[in-house]
Design a protein with these regions (language model features):
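Charged/polar, solvent-exposed surface patches and flexible loops
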Residues: 17, 21, 72, 76, ...
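Polar/charged alpha-helical tracts
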Residues: 17, 21, 169, 173, ...
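Extended, charge-rich intrinsically disordered regulatory tails
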Residues: 217-261
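Alpha-helix capping and helix-coil boundary motifs
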Residues: 7-15, 105, 126, 233-236, ...
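Metal-dependent nucleotidyltransferase catalytic core
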Residues: 6-49
């Protein structure tokens, strides 16, 4: 198959129609920002992205499963690495309340994760070259890739990926007992904020403020109160809540934040 990263800059048409007119496929499967179709017995995956995410998608998707392997290193450090770059998911009161972008500067990202960006630029001739590249990171840990240490979604996804399973075999044969550093994740986050010159902790406070604001608003007015007082349930309850919110915003001049009301 072939993956094509397509920048949507300057394109205002319908992607499905463009594919139908240009490639005349038998079938098109659409999932999120990806369109999969057949062309001359080859499966094509059109991955449509905004111009600002073109480079980050290229870096993540290049060289087979390498981006996935790098993502596990970032995860061990309390960060996320994917098709949008490097970021941090902040949890407050056991719930995710915000996503904080850290960087799209790949030489710096690779440096921070303990990877050689110049070597990445050279490219890789084989899966074994990719495997060895990951193992050489000082943040590599043999256990972090084991199925038992993945969540259900990643476990099910990676079981279907031949390159991931080959990597597990390679680790078992060549690097079975490498233990990576025991990262102090709050310390790593502080180091990242300095290294990338980003306002991580300001954003954390902003997300926590808005989370507290939502909790306060919910304590004042929520679906349970409406259900108890008026006996509404299901769809009727949802409509009533939506209409009340619309009334507050449109007729009472509360435009900045419904939760402030």
């Amino acid at each position: 198959d072939m993956d094509l990263i397509v920048s949507m800059e300057g394109f205002n048409g319908n992607v499905r129609t463009y594919i139908e007119d240009t490639f005349e496929p038998n079938e098109i499967f659409h999932n999120g920002n990806a369109y999969s179709f057949d062309y001359k017995e080859l499966q094509i995956d059109f991955i449509t992205v905004s111009p600002e995410d073109y480079g980050s998608n290229y870096h993540y998707l290049a060289f087979n499963d390498l981006g996935n392997f790098i993502g596990r290193i970032a995860q061990s450090m309390g960060l996320k690495y994917g098709q949008e770059g490097l970021w941090y998911n902040h949890f407050h009161n056991d719930q995710k309340v915000g996503k904080i972008m850290i960087s799209k500067d790949y030489p710096k990202i690779f440096d921070f994760l303990g990877l050689n960006y110049a070597r990445w630029i050279e490219g890789f001739d084989s899966l074994e070259d990719i495997f060895e590249y990951i193992i050489q990171s000082p943040n590599f840990d043999s256990e972090m890739y084991e199925m038992k240490n993945l969540n259900k979604i990643n476990r099910e996804r990676n079981l279907k990926r031949k390159s991931y399973m080959s990597f597990l075999d390679y680790i078992a044969e060549n690097a079975p007992n490498i233990t990576g550093p025991d990262h102090n994740k709050p310390k790593i986050l502080k180091e990242a904020s300095i290294f990338f010159e980003c306002n991580v902790f300001t954003e954390i406070k902003r997300f926590e403020y808005h989370d507290a604001e939502r909790a306060y608003a919910s304590a004042k007015f929520n679906g349970g109160m409406v259900m108890d007082k008026y006996g509404l349930k299901g769809q009727a309850l949802g409509v009533a809540m939506k209409n009340f919110k619309g009334l507050v915003i449109s007729h009472m001049g509360i435009t900045e934040s419904y939760h402030q009301y």
